Amino acid sequence: GIDLNGVLEESQKKALRNLLNEHEVLFFRNQDISPLHHKLLALSFGPIQTHPAYETVKGFPEITILESTAKKPSKIEAWHSDMTFKKHPPMATVLKSVIVPERGGDTLWASMTAAYEGLSSHMQTFLSDLIAVHDFSHGFKETLAEPGGRERLEDAIIMNPPVRHPVIRTHPETGKKVIFVNSLFTTHIEDLTRSESEEILNLLFKHIITPEFTCRFQWHPHSLAIWDNRSTQHKPINDYFPNHRRMERITIDGDNPY
């Protein structure tokens, strides 16, 4: 095992990165790490990228709070990769559990590498040169529809205009091809008609959640997950209302998908 509540040696950092490239998502139990060591763990993978819309841990603006309560239940339950509305989406995410419900609240992950490899060669070729648009506003449309929602997110909308990413990207470390569209932030594929774009995206959204491409993690107190945001998608399961769930997340800066 490994104790993440401390300073990692260079050999441990290298081992974690190699394991992440191989398995795409890593799970750890019994890691009661402080906010400082959460930050240091994330920094071992690269510079940190902040989120424009969520509350953060006091004294640690890098750590995003993801919280669901009876008064304010979580609204996001779609499959997605984190923050693909950015020109440089995060390369990885480090998420730790702080408060977990007695039952429910699991998270699902899907391998976009396996999903790509599960396509026919003809479909791989067809998708290879397509470009899709990702939009911050599309992912937060429920919040924007709330009273005062647009005013609260106005600055984030201005700072995050729609961006273009390849439908099929190349993983910069493994060289493998992955599907890089998601139902939360991807709005359409360029140079196709609206109906063509919708049909292709819906086909891909259905394909990527094929059970053979997925895994499921049951959170315990002080559990921690690290996932490769370039080659996976995930989905939180909101099946624990009205119970309380609080997670704390750090995203690590990535590159421009190609």
Language-model regions: role of each:
Residues 1-224, 229-258:
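Non-heme Fe(II) oxygenase catalytic core, chiefly the N-lobe of the double-stranded beta-helix
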